[in-house]
Structure formats: structure tokens, C-alpha cells
Amino acid sequence: MKKKLAMLLAATMLVMLFTGCGAGGKEDKGELNLYTWDGMFPQEILDGFEKETGIRINYSNFDYDEDMLAKLEETRGSDYDLVIADDYIIELAIQESLAQKLDTSRISTYDNLNPVFMSQFYDPQNEYTVPYGAGIPLI
């Protein structure tokens, strides 16, 4: 199970490696600056990803989406390659020009993404985001 999770993370990260948030202009293929909720990925999964890909993950986390947005505003998004956050915060980050457009030609599996999860309200033209996982509301 752990190996499957590590492979899933590896595939996901490689797909989204070029989704950089800011226009920092630096491209270091040996590192991935990830910013998401605390506890999103167990350390053993991150370690497995690094071991299998050779890509070092600089994992920063936040507790609240608003804290994440404040950090992106402070750095103009340039400190992170990949941010995983809630939809309404993604919409604000795009509106504030804190995210850069995707170069989908560099994402080899882009055409395999399920269209059901594409064209969301926060990115209707799929210019800035790719789906990471499906959220299903529960009652």
C-alpha cells in the first residue's frame, strides 16, 4: 500500500511539476517546492517520492487557506512550484496574479485527465490548474 501511495504521489507530482505558482523564473528539475495543508502527505510518502524520482521535495505547510494566500501574496507566489489548496482560494490567487499559466505541452499525461474534473469555476479554461483529486460533498 505504501509503495502504491508513493507511486501515486510521484505520478501526481510529475504531472504537476510545471504548474508553478509564481513567475519566479527559476527552474530546478532537482527540487519541488510544495505548499499544502499540514499532514497532507506523510513523510514516508515524500521520502518514497524522493527516492524513486531523485527529486527533492521542500515541503511547506499551512493550517488555513487564508494563511496560505497571505504567504503567496507576500512572496508573489515565487517561492512555490506547486500549491494544493481549496477552490475559493485558488480563484483568489488567480485573480491576484499569484499563479502562472500552465504549459500543458510539458505535461505528458494532460490528455488523460478526466474532463469531469476540468473547467472548474475557479479556472474555467484550465489555464492554471490540473485536478489533484475529486471532492465529493457528504451530508
Describe the residue ranges of each PLM region.
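Short hydrophobic/aromatic-enriched beta-strand-loop microsegments
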Residues: 21, 58-60, 101-104
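Short, low-complexity disordered leader/linker segments with a strong preference
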Residues: 1-32
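Early extracytoplasmic/lumenal segment of secretory-pathway proteins
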Residues: 25-92
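Phosphate-coordinating loops and pocket residues in cytosolic domains that bind phosphorylated ligands
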Residues: 95
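A structural signal for short loop-to-beta-strand junctions that line the ligand-binding cleft
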Residues: 78-87, 100-139
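Glycine-rich, phosphate-binding/catalytic loops in enzymes
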Residues: 50-52, 99-102
